[in-house]
Amino acid sequence: MEQNVLNTDLTGKVAVVTGASGTLCSIFAKALARAGAKVALLGRNMEKLKALADEIEAEGGIARGYTCNVMNKANCLQVAEDVMAELGSCDILVNGAGGNNARANTDKEYFEMADLEDDTVTFFDLDESGVEMVFDLNFIGTLLPTQAFARQMVGRPGCNILNISSMNAYLPLTKIPAYSGSK
C-alpha cells in the first residue's frame, strides 16, 4: 500500500465518501483507505465505483461501492443501512458529490449592455431548472447524506463530517453564478 498521507491511523473506522468516483473524492477515498479506514464509495456509476474499490483492495485496503443518488432521501437512508450492515457505523463522512449544469451558466465573465441584444446567454437568460439542479445537487446532495449517516455518528466521540466546497464559495466566478452561490 502507498504512503499514508493523512499521517493518522484510521484502523477500525468506517469512512463514507459521496461522489467517490470523481477526481477529487477518489483520491480522498484512497487516502482514507491507506490510513486504515474501511471506505464506502458512494456514487451514481457502479462500474467506476467497482473499479475504484478494486484498486483500493489491490493495495490492501477495504472498500465497497454503493450506488447512491444523494438527492433522494430514501436512497440515502437505504445506503446508510447497507453500509452499516456491511462495514459498520459511519465514523467519517466526506460529502464530495457536487457539480454544475451548463444551463445555469452565462456565456461571458462580464455583462455588457449589448449582450441583451444578441444571442449571448446572460444572467437574465439563466434556465431556472438548470439553476435548481445545481442548488439541489450541491446543497440537498450534502444535506441528505448528512441526515442519513450522521444518525450513526451522534454521541460517538471521534466522528467527523467533511463538506467539500469550492474556492468559488469565497471568490465567485460570474460565469457560473448558480454553482458559486450553491457552494
What do the PLM-derived regions correspond to, one by one?
Residues 112-143, 162:
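Catalytic Tyr-X3-Lys loop
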Residues 46-47, 67-79, 128:
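The beta1-alpha1 cofactor-binding region of Rossmann-like NAD(H)/NADP(H)-dependent oxidoreductases
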Residues 14, 21-23:
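Conserved glycine-rich cofactor-binding loop
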Residues 37-51:
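Conserved glycine-rich Rossmann-like NAD(P)H-binding loop of the short-chain dehydrogenase/reductase
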Residues 146, 182:
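Active-site helix of classical SDR
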Residues 172-180:
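Active-site loop-to-helix junction immediately N-terminal to the catalytic Tyr of the SDR YXXXK motif
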Residues 166:
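Residue(s) in the substrate-gating loop at a strand-loop-helix junction
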Residues 96-119:
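Conserved NAD(P)H cofactor-binding loop of Rossmann-fold oxidoreductase domains
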